[in-house]
């Protein structure tokens, strides 16, 4: 199986290594406008193969035509955030990149399963979907998998438990209006409301963890100063790609086409739980949201809708 990575920056390079280390594909194409950067990272990852004990092809190029025959295409290309920037401030620059990439996918790999990572995430998935004209169930954005991982860590640290025992659920946009679901998040099977009721954690502490989850990316951007997070985004995308390539039928929160789902009637993308397998988005899980949860989710979708209006000028 062939996986193409569009963008050879920190996330793209990390993904190339993770795919090789997990022996997930027989061929990886690492593509970047800076061909030497792509070739250099491809060569570096290739030299780990004897240590991994796995034979595969890892190529670096600036030529988008090399995405032909890809089973999965992962897009990380674009400008990352700098300290003080919001994801939304990247729209004008990254929408142009997404449109160009989408047109190439339409021409060279229209049957590939596409995962978008570029921010502002939900808007960029929409731009690429419009440009590539592919099935809505064959394109997703990396959203809730990353956000839930951050929330899982913060809860585990606060409670002093294994991260493996914590399961969080974060819906909505991959941005400040994301919706971490308090009552659907669990620790060893106990919901957060139950943990609060028995005094293992306070509601105020849970609220502070939710806020830290919302600003988790910005916290890292402020510390790095020259870029944004890449290890956890890469690991999150890998989980999504595995679910597709290995037909795992795995429940993941991804940014998907919302039309006809959760009461949304237009072509907006947002994060909801889906079953991911070899058919792409094979099924949507419609959660029974409380009035407050639904209001927050609708506000999140509305925030994305407003940004999509800005991106429509490119079509």
UniProtKB/Swiss-Prot annotation:
Catalytic activity from the UniProt record: (S)-malate + NAD(+) = oxaloacetate + NADH + H(+)
Keyword field: NAD, Oxidoreductase, Tricarboxylic acid cycle
Enzyme class: oxidoreductase
Binding-site list for NAD(+): 7-12, 32, 94, 117-119
GO biological process: lactate metabolic process; tricarboxylic acid cycle
InterPro entries listed in its UniProt record: L-lactate/malate_DH, Lactate/malate_DH_C, Lactate/malate_DH_N, Lactate_DH/Glyco_Ohase_4_C, Malate_DH_type3, NAD(P)-bd_dom_sf
Record has Glycosyltransferase as a keyword: no
Record-level Gene Ontology MF annotations: L-lactate dehydrogenase activity; L-malate dehydrogenase (NAD+) activity
Binding site for substrate: 81, 87, 119, 150
PANTHER family associated with the record: L-2-HYDROXYCARBOXYLATE DEHYDROGENASE (NAD(P)(+)), L-LACTATE DEHYDROGENASE
Record-stated family: Belongs to the LDH/MDH superfamily. MDH type 3 family.
Protein name: Malate dehydrogenase
